[in-house]
Amino acid sequence: MRADRPGHRSRGINPGPGMFTLVGPDERDDPEVAVDPIRRVAMISLHTSPLDQPGTGDAGGMNVYVIELSKRLAAQGIAVDIFTRATTSAVEPLVEAYDGVQVRHIHAGPFEGLTKAELPGQLCVFAREVLRAEAAQPVGHYDVVHSHYWLSGQVGALARDRWGVPLVHSMHTMAKVKNDALAEGDTPEPAARIIGEEQVVEAADMLVANTDIEAKQLVNMYDADPSRVEVVHPGVDLGVFRPQDRSTARARLGLPEDAAVLLFAGRIQPLKAPDVLLRAVAELLAQTPELRSRLVVPIVGGPSGSGLEHPESLAQLASELGLDGAGGTGPVVRFVPPVSQEELARWCAAATLVAVPSYNESFGLVAAEAQATGTPVVAAAVGGLTTVVRDGRSGLLVDTHDPRDWADALRRVVENDAFRDRLAAGALEQARLFSWEHTARQTLDVYRRARAEIREAV
């Protein structure tokens, strides 16, 4: 790492007021001293709490990532403090989420009414409160800052310079990538976000990418230094997402034993493309009308932001496509509010397949979780989904978002039990590649490397 890289202040050299050196003078003079162990990590997840229900508001895969990584780090003896913005007065300022994992709810702006697009106006207040929380602790309280999403990265960069510790950053999503793959009618990410992301990429000591594809995007689209980018795959809680008896799962969920269940699970937003699935189902039924009597399409999740239980536009589309049962044939589409991880695992196990038609995914956690239950995935051949799903082995990848192509892929799985069984076996095999324990070990290696390179820089 170059200590003189713009935006990176050398450690242990002329610290400003209130800063402390990561390495004391005596230690710097002793080449035998090894890098101190990582004892405590400050996780920053400004815009969404890891305690929120995934599938609601802005809560999704990132929430699962932050809390699961934190739990696994704590299991290795590393204390984790997660800083997030309070969105209700009902939560305590400090919550002991798990042994070794604390969630600190920071008051920054009103509890309700702020959209994610309005949160940059609260960065200053949020950052101030994070710095105050650290200032109340002994000097050197945190060894690493790990920020998630660009808003958190802005705060993390300030904490990095103030505390004299390395900043590790995970993008999770990137504006330039999203804008290159916009759904029809979706709103482009603003220039302010792009600028903010570029600043975070420049400020971070290490960048964690979910896949090789994301790593290349960081280098090619954001001019990230390749030597500062490490690929660490997210994991799956294999204790929760595991094979279950399908008949039992269906009985618990009120699904017919002989149903063809095409599950969509996630936030209902243009990027996730649930409309593509509905149009594909309509195409499938037009070509194979005899499927209607046993076809069930659960849409499990809620819209981004506050929203309704199911957005009117998607419900209207289901009606227009004749999938709502208004004609007396019974509803094909069922809207299901967001569910717990345990309940989601049951839905995945009950499904014939899980559909992930997103226009982009940095990883595609729900696809990995579905495979861990032994359920094949039909996914768009975009972003991290091409890493998670092995085409023809654990599921099918669809190169387009054309409903006809999607209908063909759905039909291949629904109508061929032997093929589906082969995919199910491959899904279980593929799922073994992803565990949160492995993610935590690799992430800890990134933390250690960031600390070691800061020592070299000073």
From Swiss-Prot:
Pfam families from the UniProt entry: Glyco_trans_4_4 (PF13579), Glycos_transf_1 (PF00534)
InterPro entries: Glyco_trans_1 (IPR001296), Glyco_trans_4-like_N (IPR028098), Glycosyltransferase_grp1 (IPR050194), Mycothiol_biosynthesis_MshA (IPR017814)
Gene3D superfamilies assigned: Glycogen Phosphorylase B (3.40.50.2000)
Coiled-coil regions listed in the entry: none
Positions contributing to 1D-myo-inositol 3-phosphate binding: H47, D58, A59, G60, G61, M62, N63, K116, Y149, T173, R193
Binding site for UDP-N-acetyl-alpha-D-glucosamine: Q53, P54, G61, R267, K272, V339, E361, E369
Keyword annotations of the record: Glycosyltransferase, Magnesium, Metal-binding, Transferase
GO MF annotation terms: acetylglucosaminyltransferase activity; D-inositol-3-phosphate glycosyltransferase activity; magnesium ion binding
Positions of Mg(2+) binding: A351, T375
Record note on quaternary structure: Homodimer.
Family (UniProt): Belongs to the glycosyltransferase group 1 family. MshA subfamily.
Its biological purpose: Catalyzes the transfer of a N-acetyl-glucosamine moiety to 1D-myo-inositol 3-phosphate to produce 1D-myo-inositol 2-acetamido-2-deoxy-glucopyranoside 3-phosphate in the mycothiol biosynthesis pathway.
Protein name in UniProt: D-inositol 3-phosphate glycosyltransferase
Originating species: Nocardioides sp. (strain ATCC BAA-499 / JS614)
Gene: mshA
